């Protein structure tokens, strides 16, 4: 019985510490810039309009609507940063392969969801958002 009480006490201690750190981060002033904004997850994509996720067209569309964006970034074999959600190319390009094994030149030949859109580099998306005042949330994969 005493062992169970110690385990429960330790779990409560860990929970208290975790909540303290979580709460202190959530109230940090730097988060205020991200609050009360609309974000387009992987850009403002729409398959009905042939605007695939994580494409420059999707990010342009998000900007036109005043949305910030969440995007995923992978490091390619040649050191280039590519904006793409999956590690596997198949779902969005129809090509079998692993994104991280490619170079920027390899990706330039692939089209997203049977559209003319290609997999953008991070620098291209940053250029689109430069000067807009809209936030980007970048997830490193």
Model-based region annotation:
Residues 2-141:
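Phosphate-group recognition and catalysis centered on beta-loop-alpha active-site segments
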């Amino acid at each position: 019985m005493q062992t169970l009480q110690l385990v429960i006490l330790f779990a409560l201690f860990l929970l208290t510490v975790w909540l303290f750190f979580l709460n202190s981060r959530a109230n940090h002033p730097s988060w205020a810039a991200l609050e009360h904004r609309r974000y387009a997850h992987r850009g403002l994509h729409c398959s009905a309009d042939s605007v695939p996720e994580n494409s420059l067209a999707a990010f342009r569309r998000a900007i036109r609507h005043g949305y910030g964006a969440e995007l995923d970034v992978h490091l390619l074999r040649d050191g280039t940063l590519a904006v793409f959600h999956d590690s596997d190319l198949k779902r969005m390009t129809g090509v079998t392969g692993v994104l991280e094994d490619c170079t920027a030149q390899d990706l330039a030949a692939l089209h997203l969801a049977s559209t003319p859109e290609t997999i953008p580099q991070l620098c291209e998306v940053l250029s689109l958002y430069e000067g807009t005042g809209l936030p980007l949330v970048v997830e490193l994969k």
